[in-house]
Amino acid sequence: MKASQFFVSTLKEAPADAEITSHKLMMRAGMIKRLGAGIYSYMPMGLRVIRKVEAIIREEMNRAGAVELLMPVVQPAELWQETGRFEKMGPELMRVKDRHDRDFIIQPTSEEVVTDIARQELRSYRQLPKNFYHIQTKFRDERRPRFGVMRGREFTMKDAYSFDRDEAAAGRSYDAMYAAYGRIFDRFGLSYRAVAADTGAIGGDRSHEFQVIAETGEDAIVYCPTSDYAANIELAECLPLAAQRPVPIQPLTKTPTPGKATCADVAALLNLPLTQTVKSLVLATDDRNDGGDIVKTTVWLLLVRGDHELNEVKAGKLPGLKAGFRFATVGEIDAHFGCKPGYLGPIGLKQPVRVIADRTVAHMGDFVCGANDADFHYTGVNWGRDLPEPDLVADIRNAVVGDPSPDGKGVLAIQRGIEVGHVFYLGTKYSAAMNATYLDETGKPRLMEMGCYGIGVTRILGAAIEQRHDARGIVWPTAIAPFEVVICPIGYDRSAEVRQAADTLHDELQALGMDLMLDDRGERPGAMFADWELIGIPQRVVISDRGLKEGQVELQGRQEAEAGKLAVAEVVAQLRARLRD
C-alpha cells in the first residue's frame, strides 16, 4: 500500500472536546471523525485496526466451535416484551415506531433474538450444544456519551450465545469461551486480567470481566499478587479484619464535636485513628401495592468503618434490599434519627430501623459513631453493652489495598482497568421467559441453559491506546496495528535511487505477506516521521540517498529510542524476525 493511494489525515492538535488520551490520539491520527454525540465515522486508518481485531476474534471463536451468524440491528419490540426488558431497560434502550405504528428497538444486545432463533431451530438434545456469535453494530442512548469510542452511543461488539442441555454442559461451554477469550486477548498483545464480576443487568450467576490494564481505567481491579485471585471491586470479598471483637475498655461517652460532620474531621479532633470511627449511611426501601402506591417504607442503617466505602452492589444483594433501594430523604432521616446527616449513629433512635453492620464494624470495639445529636459523637461504643447486636452482619464495603485475600494466599492490591470483554452464565433466565425448550431422550421438553459472551470491538481500540502510548503518539501492538511496517523514503519525489530502493523493498515485503505502507507523499522527514509515530506503526524503515551510498538503511521500532543502521540486503530478514517475535 502506498500513502498516495490510501487516506492519511493527521492533526497537530486534538479537538477541544477530546477529553482522554485515546480520544485525543484517535482524532489526531485520523482514525475516527465525530458525526454526533457518541457517534463516529471510522476512517480508513481506524477501520484497519477494527478489521484486525475482528479477524483475531473470528479465528478464535471458530476454533472454539462457535458458529457465526448476523442478527439485525432493528428488532421487534414483542421479543423484548416477552422478557420484560422493553420496559425495564429505561431510556438507554432506543425505541422507535415504523409507519404502521409498530414498536421496534435499536439493539444494545441480542439475547431475545438469538433465543427466538434457538426455540425455533434447536428442537432436540441431539442439536446441542450450540454456540452462535455475531459481530454487529449496537446502540445505547447513553445520557452522557464521552471519551470517544470508550463510551459512545453507537459501537461494535462481538456477541456469542451458547445453548446447552443442562447446567454441567453450560459450564463446559462457559469454560470454553473463557479459554477462547484468553487466547484472543493474548493475541491482541495487551496486558489484561480476567476478573470475577457482578452479572449486572444481563442476569445470571457466573461472570468474568476481561480488563485491559490502564492507569486511566474506570474500573478498579482487586487482585492478589501471590495467587490467582482477581475480581472487580464490585464483587471482591472483604474478610473481617479482626478474628474476634476486643474486650471493651473505654466507657461510653457523649463527646462534643462541633462542626465535625465527617469521620476524618472527628478522628482529627479527637486525635484518634480514622480506623476507630464508624460512618452511617441511611437507605430506604418502599413496598408498593398493585397500583404502584407506596404502602410501607423501611429505613435501613448501614455501618462501615470510617476509612471504608459502601459497596452498593453488595448491599443490593442483601435480604430486604434485593428489590431495590434508595438513599433516604432528609425528612425520613429526621423522623428516625432526629438529627441531620453527619452526626447519625445506631444509638438513641426515634423510630426503629434495620441495622446492617459491615463485617469489619461487627468486630470493632470502643469505636466512635454519631450520637444523633448535632455536634456530638459517642466514643467508647461497644456492641452488646451500649447497643444491640446488628440485625445483619454482611460484607458491604469496597476492598482496599492490604486487605487479606479471600483465598488466604496473601494480601490484596488494586489496579485500574478498562472492561473490554465479559462472559456470563445465564442459566434459564431468557429461555424460561421465552419458552426456549428442547426435547430430551425421553421426549420431554426441557429449558435450554444459556451463556452470553461479549467483546467490545471498537472499545478495544481506545483501551489499547490508553495502555500503549507515549508523548509522540500511539504505540500499537503489532497484531492490531493498522500497518506493521512503514517505509519512509527521504526525497522519494526527487531521487530516482531512493524511489527505486523504496519501491523494490515495498514489493519484496508485500510479496512476503507483510502489511506495510510506503509513504510516497514527498513530505519533509520531520513531518513524515511525526505522522507515523503519531499513528503508531510498529516498525519504520528510512531510506535516504546518504544511506544508500553506504549500502545501508535505518530500521527503528516504535518503542526504540534510536534507529539502527543495517545493510540493505539484511532489512528483510530483520523485519521478518521482528514481526515473528
Curated annotation (Swiss-Prot):
Domain of life, per lineage: Bacteria
Alphabetized UniProt keyword annotations: Aminoacyl-tRNA synthetase, ATP-binding, Cytoplasm, Ligase, Nucleotide-binding, Protein biosynthesis
Keyword Nucleotide-binding found: yes
Organism annotation: Methylibium petroleiphilum (strain ATCC BAA-1232 / LMG 22953 / PM1)
Matching Gene3D superfamilies: Anticodon-binding domain, Bira Bifunctional Protein, Domain 2, YbaK/aminoacyl-tRNA synthetase-associated domain
Record localization: Cytoplasm
Biological processes, Gene Ontology terms: prolyl-tRNA aminoacylation
Domain comment, as recorded: Consists of three domains: the N-terminal catalytic domain, the editing domain and the C-terminal anticodon-binding domain.
GO molecular function, one term: proline-tRNA ligase activity
Name of this chain's protein: Proline--tRNA ligase
Catalytic reaction list: tRNA(Pro) + L-proline + ATP = L-prolyl-tRNA(Pro) + AMP + diphosphate
Function: Catalyzes the attachment of proline to tRNA(Pro) in a two-step reaction: proline is first activated by ATP to form Pro-AMP and then transferred to the acceptor end of tRNA(Pro). As ProRS can inadvertently accommodate and process non-cognate amino acids such as alanine and cysteine, to avoid such errors it has two additional distinct editing activities against alanine. One activity is designated as 'pretransfer' editing and involves the tRNA(Pro)-independent hydrolysis of activated Ala-AMP.
Gene transcribed to yield this protein: proS
Subunit structure: Homodimer.
Family stated for the protein in its record: Belongs to the class-II aminoacyl-tRNA synthetase family. ProS type 1 subfamily.
Major subcellular location class: cytoplasm
EC number: 6.1.1.15
GO cellular component: cytosol
